[in-house]
């Protein structure tokens, strides 16, 4: 294969990595597996343009993107729209997609796995056409992200500290809003404190990531209006890996979820793969696109695929 690797030097672990040494390691692993590879190390503000240029080239067989969860989400969106196979190097805090794909979380180990891996047809979700590889969420999560962004942090530990402060803030000020939804034709109106729509159902890990990205469904989760004690209980359930079995969570499975906010009298936000995004129209159309994202994974991945 002819591969282009694009690494976000501003993303997570890469900020403190010798990127020249790392690039040499990646090149050695891919050439040892019989592939041609080009490597670009760019800043965060150059990532999207570099990804789009690479995915538009007719001479490449795959790209590899490295960075935090935001970088991986952006790369997945570009790769999906162009049909380009994508490998990922997890350099972020959570690395949720890498966990779903059972890739090593060590940036020095994953290149060899990808170089000797195979391509699978995975699912990807979209919110009004914008790709998400992990989840779309509103309510508790969106408020926590908004609170966290109001705190300054410059390191992984700083981000964790800011997240903890934000979570405490949300416990004492939980949201409560009304939604109407249509999930594969099932229509309801509910008051909720939280909504989450995931690309495939969450597994049972504390970090709430899908254990399989090939089942072809969205996971649709809602929580009723919660008091501070209720938010604390839900947080405890999540920490125990019991989110899906929590008595506070209603779970559905769907191919399509349409959301409407009948009392949208102020600015509301959602979170798409960790990024806070404003909702302007009062409606959101969520879809799953089964098998439309081609991903480079390890050779021992249980999903059927072809060796590269």
Residue locations for each model-derived region?
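Gly/Ser/Thr-rich active-site loops/lids in small-molecule metabolic enzymes
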Residues: 152-161, 206, 210-230
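ATP/NTP phosphate-donor binding region
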Residues: 1-62, 73, 308
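N-terminal glycine-rich "phosphate-gripper" loop used for MgATP/nucleotide binding
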Residues: 65-70
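ATP/nucleoside-binding phosphotransfer catalytic cores, i.e., glycine-rich phosphate-binding loops
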Residues: 16, 183, 189, 222-308
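Short, high-confidence coil segments that cap the C-terminus of an alpha-helix
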Residues: 59-60, 119, 254
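Glycine-rich phosphate/pyrophosphate-binding beta-alpha loops
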Residues: 137, 196-209, 276
């Amino acid at each position: 294969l002819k591969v282009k690797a694009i690494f976000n030097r501003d993303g997570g672990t890469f900020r403190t990595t010798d990127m020249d040494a790392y690039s040499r390691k990646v090149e050695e692993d891919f050439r040892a597996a019989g592939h041609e590879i080009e490597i670009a190390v760019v800043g965060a503000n150059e990532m999207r343009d570099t990804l789009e240029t690479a995915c538009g080239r007719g001479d490449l067989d795959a790209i590899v993107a490295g960075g935090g969860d935001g970088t991986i989400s952006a790369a997945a969106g570009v790769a999906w729209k162009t049909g380009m196979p994508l490998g990922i190097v997890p350099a972020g805090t959570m690395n949720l997609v890498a966990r779903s794909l059972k890739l090593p979380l060590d940036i020095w180990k994953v290149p060899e796995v990808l170089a000797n891996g195979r391509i699978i047809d995975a699912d990807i979700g979209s919110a009004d056409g914008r790709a998400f590889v992990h989840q779309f969420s509103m309510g508790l999560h969106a408020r926590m992200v908004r609170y966290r962004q109001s705190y300054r942090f410059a390191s992984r530990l700083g981000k964790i500290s800011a997240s903890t402060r934000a979570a405490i803030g949300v416990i004492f000020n939980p949201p409560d809003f009304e939604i109407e939804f249509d999930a594969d034709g099932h229509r309801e109106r509910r008051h909720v404190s939280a909504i989450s729509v995931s690309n495939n159902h969450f597994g049972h890990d504390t970090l709430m990531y899908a254990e399989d990205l090939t089942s072809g469904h969205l996971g649709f989760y809602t929580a009723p209006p919660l008091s501070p004690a209720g938010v604390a209980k839900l947080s405890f359930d999540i920490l125990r890996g019991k989110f899906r079995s929590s008595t506070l969570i209603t779970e559905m499975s769907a191919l399509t979820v349409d959301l409407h906010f009948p009392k949208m009298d102020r600015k509301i936000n959602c979170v798409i793969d960790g990024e806070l995004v404003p909702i302007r129209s009062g409606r959101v159309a969520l879809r799953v696109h089964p098998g439309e994202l081609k991903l480079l994974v390890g050779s021992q991945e249980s999903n059927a695929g072809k060796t590269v």
